[in-house]
C-alpha cells in the first residue's frame, strides 16, 4: 500500500477525519480520471474503442482499490467447506461416462491462459512457445490433445487462447502451422492497464503506446480479467449461439490440465439435476504448496482465499497442511450462460491483488490485478473437485522442465502420463541451482536427460554437467563449490550419493 493511502488510514482513526479522507480520495480519483482521459486522446481511431474499454475497466478497479482497507477477509469467518461442497474425484469418476460422449464434448470450449512470457526461464516471447517434450511446445501439446478428442469422438471442441499484449503478436504468427489440424483456434486479448506510481498513485504512462520509454508503463491485469475480456471480445456470445455451455479454463503451462470426460459428464448430467455454474479442481497440499490458494466456506459460500489476503498473524495457520489440506490448481469449469449473466449485472466480485514492482530505472509502481478463481463466490451452485495430483503438472522452472522431459512421463496424443515403470505415484523433488535457470544453459548442461524412474530427490548446485545415459536413483545431491566444476560421466549410476568437490572429464 502506498504512503499516500497509509497516511489516509492514520487519518481514519482521528475524529472527523473520515470526511476529510473522503474528499482526498475523490480528488485522487478525479486526478486519475483526468490522466486516463489524456492518455485516451493519444489513441488512434482504430484502437480508440478498445483502449476506452481497457481504461474504463482500470478506473473501476482503481475505485475499488481506494475503498478497500486492511485484509480482505475476516479470519474469524473462515470455515472449512462442508463435506458435500468438495467432492472426491473418485466419486465423480464412479458415475461413468454417457453413452454418447460426443454430445457432451460438443458443449465444451477449451480456454488456455496464454498471457505469460518465458522470462523467468530466460526465454524471450510467449512461454507457450518453449519446447517441453520431443521439441513440442506447450501450445503444440494443447493442440494435439484437442485434435485427438475431436478425431476420436467426431466432435468440434474449439481452443481459445487468452493472449496479452505481450504474447499476442508472436502467438498469432505461429498459429498458421495448425491450419491443417482438426481444431478451430480463436484468440482474444486480456486488457492492458496502466501501472501506477506507488507514491502518487497516478498512471506513469503518458500515451497509449507501449514502446520506447512507455514499454514498462502497461501490464496485463491478471487472469481474473478473463470474464470482461472474453465478454468484450464477442466470443462469449458467439459460443452461446453455437450451443456451447461450458468453458474449461487452465494455465497453458499446466501439462496436467487435459479435458476430463468424467468431470464434463458430471457438469452436463448432474446427479441431483441441478447444474453447477463453477467447478474448481483442487488437489491435496504437500509442503511445497503451502502458498497456494485454498477453498474455504465464507459467509455461506465457497470462497478462494489466497495467502496475500490473510492477516499476518494467521499466515502460519493458513500454510498448515493439517488445517487447509487442499489448494487451487486453477483448472476451472465455468458456465458460459452464468458468465454472461453476471458480467451484464456487473456482479463478478474478485479481490484485488496489489502487486508492487520496481522498474528498470528504479521507479516503484503498483499493478492492480485479479485472479480468475476468486470469482467462485459470485456463481451459483459452485463445487470443488479434489482431483489426483497428476492434473496439476505446472512447468514454472527448469527443475519442472527436467521432470516432464524425463522418462518419468510417457507422451500420448499430447498428454503426459506417469510412466507405468515408476513404482510409486509421487513425483521426485528436483532443485536445480542458478546455473540451470535459463533454458539455454539447462539444455547445454545435459547431454541427454538422465533416467529418473527411481529418483526421490535431486539437488544440483554450481557448475555441473551431465554426460549421456546417466541414471539417478534415491537421493542424489551434487554440489560444485565456487570455482569448481563437476562433470558427471556418461553412463554413471548415482544412487543415494552426495557428490562434491571437483570432477573434470576432458576429451583427449
Curated annotation (Swiss-Prot):
Active-site annotation: 396
An annotated GO BP: UDP-alpha-D-glucose metabolic process
Subunit note: Homooctamer.
Single GO MF descriptor: D-glucose binding
Residues where substrate binds: 115-116, 223, 251-253
Signal peptide location: none
Family, per entry: Belongs to the UDPGP type 1 family.
Residue ranges of the region described as Critical for end-to-end subunit interaction: 502-503
The enzyme's E.C. designation: 2.7.7.9
Positions carrying N6-acetyllysine: 438
Region (Oligomerization): 457-508
Phosphothreonine modification, residue list: 426
Organism listed in the record: Mus musculus (Mouse)
Binding locations of Mg(2+): 127, 253
Record localization: Cytoplasm
Gene: Ugp2
PANTHER family given in the database record: PTHR43511
UniProt cross-references to Pfam families, sorted A to Z: UDPGP
Positions where Phosphoserine occurs in the chain: 13, 434, 448, 461
InterPro entries recorded: Nucleotide-diphossugar_trans, UDPGP_fam, UDPGP_trans
Reactions listed under catalytic activity: alpha-D-glucose 1-phosphate + UTP + H(+) = UDP-alpha-D-glucose + diphosphate
Gene Ontology cellular-component terms listed: cytosol
Protein name: UTP--glucose-1-phosphate uridylyltransferase
Amino acid at each position: 500500500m502506498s504512503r499516500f493511502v497509509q497516511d489516509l488510514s492514520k487519518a481514519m482513526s482521528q475524529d472527523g477525519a473520515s470526511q476529510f479522507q473522503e474528499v482526498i480520495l475523490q480528488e485522487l480519483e478525479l486526478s486519475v480520471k483526468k490522466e486516463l482521459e489524456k492518455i485516451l486522446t493519444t489513441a488512434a481511431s482504430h484502437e480508440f474503442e478498445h483502449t476506452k474499454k481497457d481504461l474504463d475497466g482500470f478506473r473501476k478497479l482503481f475505485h475499488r482499490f481506494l475503498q478497500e482497507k486492511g485484509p480482505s477477509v475476516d479470519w474469524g469467518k473462515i470455515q472449512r467447506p462442508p463435506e458435500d461442497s468438495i467432492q472426491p474425484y473418485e466419486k465423480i469418476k464412479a458415475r461413468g461416462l454417457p453413452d454418447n460422449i460426443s454430445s457432451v464434448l460438443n458443449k465444451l470450449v477449451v480456454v488456455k491462459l496464454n498471457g505469460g512470457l518465458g522470462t523467468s526461464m530466460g526465454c524471450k516471447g510467449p512461454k507457450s512457445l518453449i519446447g517441453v517434450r520431443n521439441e513440442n511446445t506447450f501450445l503444440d501439446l494443447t493442440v494435439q490433445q484437442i485434435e485427438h478428442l475431436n478425431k476420436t469422438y467426431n466432435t468440434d471442441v474449439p481452443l481459445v487462447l487468452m493472449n496479452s499484449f505481450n504474447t499476442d503478436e508472436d502467438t498469432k504468427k505461429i498459429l498458421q502451422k495448425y491450419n491443417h489440424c482438426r481444431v478451430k483456434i480463436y484468440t482474444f486479448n486480456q486488457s492492458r492497464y496502466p501501472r501506477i506510481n506507488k507514491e502518487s498513485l497516478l498512471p506513469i504512462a503518458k500515451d497509449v503506446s507501449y514502446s520506447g520509454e512507455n514499454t514498462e508503463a502497461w501490464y496485463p491485469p491478471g487472469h481474473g480479467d478473463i470474464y470482461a475480456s472474453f465478454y468484450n471480445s464477442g466470443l462469449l456470445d458467439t459460443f452461446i449461439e453455437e450451443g456451447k455451455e461450458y468453458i474449461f479454463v487452465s494455465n497453458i503451462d499446466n501439462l496436467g490440465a487435459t479435458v476430463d470426460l468424467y468431470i464434463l459428464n458430471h457438469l452436463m448430467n448432474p446427479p441431483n439435476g441441478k447444474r453447477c455454474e463453477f467447478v474448481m479442481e483442487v488437489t491435496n497440499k504437500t509442503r511445497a504448496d503451502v502458498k497456494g490458494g485454498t477453498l474455504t466456506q465464507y459467509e455461506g459460500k465457497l470462497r478462494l482465499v489466497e495467502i496475500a489476503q490473510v492477516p499476518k498473524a494467521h499466515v502460519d495457520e493458513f500454510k498448515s497442511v493439517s488445517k487447509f489440506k487442499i489448494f487451487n490448481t486453477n483448472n476451472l469449469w465455468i458456465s458460459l450462460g452464468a458468465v454472461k449473466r453476471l458480467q451484464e449485472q456487473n456482479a463478478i466480485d474478485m479481490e484485488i491483488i496489489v502487486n508492487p514492482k520496481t522498474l528498470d530505472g528504479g521507479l516503484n509502481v503498483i499493478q492492480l490485478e485479479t485472479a480468475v478463481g476468486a470469482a467462485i463466490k459470485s456463481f451459483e451452485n459452485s463445487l470443488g473437485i479434489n482431483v489426483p495430483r497428476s492434473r496439476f503438472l505446472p512447468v514454472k522452472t527448469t527443475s519442472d522442465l527436467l521432470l516432464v522431459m524425463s522418462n518419468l512421463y510417457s507422451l500420448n496424443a499430447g498428454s503426459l502420463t506417469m510412466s507405468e515403470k515408476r513404482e510409486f505415484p509421487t513425483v521426485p523433488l528436483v532443485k536445480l541451482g542458478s546455473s540451470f535457470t535459463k533454458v539455454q544453459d539447462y539444455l547445454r548442461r545435459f547431454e541427454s536427460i538422465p533416467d529418473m524412474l527411481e529418483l526421490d530427490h535431486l539437488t544440483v548446485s554450481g557448475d555441473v554437467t551431465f554426460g549421456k545415459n546417466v541414471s539417478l536413483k534415491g537421493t542424489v545431491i551434487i554440489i560444485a563449490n565456487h570455482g569448481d566444476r563437476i562433470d558427471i560421466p556418461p553412463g554413471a549410476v548415482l544412487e543415494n550419493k552426495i557428490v562434491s568437490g571437483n570432477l573434470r572429464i576432458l576429451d583427449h
